[in-house]
Amino acid sequence: MCIRDSHHAAGGVGTAVAQICKAYGASTVIGTASTPKREFVESLGMHFVDSKSEDFVTVCKSMTGGKGVHHAIDPVGGNHLMRSYKALRRGCRLYCFGASAAVKGDRRSMVTALRMCASTPKFDPLKMMRSNKAVFGVHMGLLDDESVFKGHLEALSGMLLKGQVDPVIDSVWRFEQVAEAQRHMHDRKNRGKILLDFS
């Protein structure tokens, strides 16, 4: 049984993660989101966890007989990373790829960003060795090994051709509306990917 936990499950990455996990044979995918997105998250085959009222670590542990999940995907950052790490079972991985905890309200705040940075855990390599857990930072824009990138693209293309993944499109915005599209995503109104039309 391979169980994965994805935060912001209704967004562009979360919807893709759910489909990719299923394509790789995950028996259970756990996704956190707000209550209004519950039905949508469940329609993607994920076990829904309410991000406001439930503790995802407790849910992950309870669904796995106390063992934890195989993979945790964390776009939140800050002290949320340690909670995702605690949701892992021994020998498994946490993937960090965002820092949505750095943004609160309508505008960026240096104070909020500094608080997030200060609350980011310092993972102890010795403790990680004892628990056989791994933490990965992921930034596809900075991946410079073409062979790795090519392998990922080929795998995703194969899934698309087989119908195992079908990107969920929330909305398409004209390039002139980029600020509005960003606000739509920032306010967590999207369900799937937000696309920009450059034509």
PLM regions and their residue ranges:
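Mid-domain Rossmann-like dinucleotide-binding core that forms the NAD(H)/NADP(H) cofactor-binding site
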Residues: 4-54, 59
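Glycine-rich phosphate-binding loop and adjacent beta-alpha segment
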Residues: 26, 79-164
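Local beta-strand N-terminus motif with an aromatic residue
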Residues: 45, 68-69, 165, 178
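Structural motif corresponding to alpha-helix initiation and N-cap regions
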Residues: 53-58, 66, 78-82, 175
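A glycine-rich helix->loop->beta "capping" turn
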Residues: 63-71
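N-terminal Rossmann-like NAD(P) cofactor-binding module of classical short-chain dehydrogenase/reductase
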Residues: 70-73, 95
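C-terminal hydrophobic helical "lid"/dimerization subdomain
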Residues: 144-199
